[in-house]
Amino acid sequence: MDDELEALVIGEKQLDRKLVADILSPYVRLDRNTRNISPMEAWLGLGTDLKILVYLVARKAMMLLRFGLEAERATANEIADDTNLKLDAVNRLLRNMYAEGLLERSKGRRYFVRDDALDRVWEKIGQQKV
């Protein structure tokens, strides 16, 4: 009975690390020393919305791997700066993805991908051809 209940729990402990790796592996590499997210060639083929999602999932992975980031969450300015995307587009897409339930927003308007939304992120990225 306890195992069945534990299967309902969402959190870092239950996070599907393979799914996180599957989402990220075609698009980015993570540098532990510099704490940078390095895009690969396939990154260029992603739409702006998917770049934001991959970036935020990469931050989630860096927290799981204990890279020493202060937080998984990122502001629109941080996302725009780190990804070279236009701030207006980032703000608009963050609001849309928050409304869709893909993202959560904390104090200070810092966004992160919900653990329970990773499957939907995978589906959205899967609809894009690599």
Region spans (language model):
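Short, well-structured alpha-helical interface segments that form or flank functional binding sites
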Residues: 47-51, 74, 88-92
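A short alpha-helical element within helix-turn-helix/winged-helix DNA-binding domains
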Residues: 71-81
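Short, amphipathic alpha-helical interaction segments positioned at domain boundaries
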Residues: 118-130
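Long, low-complexity, charged/polar intrinsically disordered regions in eukaryotic proteins
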Residues: 1-44
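Short helix->loop/beta-hairpin flanking segments within DNA-binding domains
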Residues: 49-72
